[in-house]
Amino acid sequence: MESLVNKNIILGVTGGIAAYKSAEIVRHLKKSGSSVRVVMTASAEEFITPLTMQALSGNRVSTELLDVEAEAAMGHIELAKWADGILIAPATANTLARLSSGRGDDLLSTVTLAFNGPIALAPAMNQAMWRDSRTQGNLDSLIGNGFTICGPDSGEQACGDVGLGRMLEPIQILDIFSSLFDKGILLGKDVLITAGPTQEPIDPVRFITNRSSGKMGYNSVSYTHLRAHET
């Protein structure tokens, strides 16, 4: 993750059970040579304390949009100008909906609106919420607006369900996020990606197919759209 050296990174933490993994993300970012400032939503504070994130990042944690002290210097604009990149992990279904609609009703969403640079989201939610057509519509909108989606993973969830919706492990998220600062050979290239199952006819009646979920193609789109001229 050499591309993160000397980068100013905002880590957004929202209110999901996976918020505890955000502490490890801060640790990895610092180890990679990044300066980290953490922005937490009110619900995130129910899962992990600002004091923990402050101790790990070495910087004051921002939580309030209407913070009198911070807004004396237009805090949300100052944060947006300071950052080289924004990573929101975990990104709940509510967060995806808020960002997709362009709402700016808390500090994190307002900073995101004011920021002009790479933004990555690491979704974390129940598998039914992930499959919901409205969530998928929000994801399509976010990808269309230049957001990078990291994951999610499939497996057992905190509620006991099994399926897509688990947040990727911190190191997996950071592998994707760091690549946003290293455009490499795809810069200026047009990329075509296919996803999902295919069918190859054997005869007019029968065909060979596979059980592809499209997950690999979906993640490939997230990986390439900021590195290519058109994906």
Positions of predicted regions on the chain:
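Glycine-rich oxoanion-binding loops at beta->alpha junctions
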Residues: 54-88, 93-98
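A short, basic/flexible loop-to-alpha-helix module at the beginning of a structural domain
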Residues: 1-3, 178-185, 197-200
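Glycine-rich phosphate/pyrophosphate-binding loop and the adjoining helix
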Residues: 154-191
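Short, glycine-/small-residue-rich phosphate/pyrophosphate-handling segment
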Residues: 117-153, 165-172
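N-terminal phosphate-binding or glycine-rich loops at protein starts, especially the Walker A/P-loop
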Residues: 1-42, 121-123, 206-222
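Conserved small/polar residues in nucleotide/adenosyl-binding loops
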Residues: 224-231
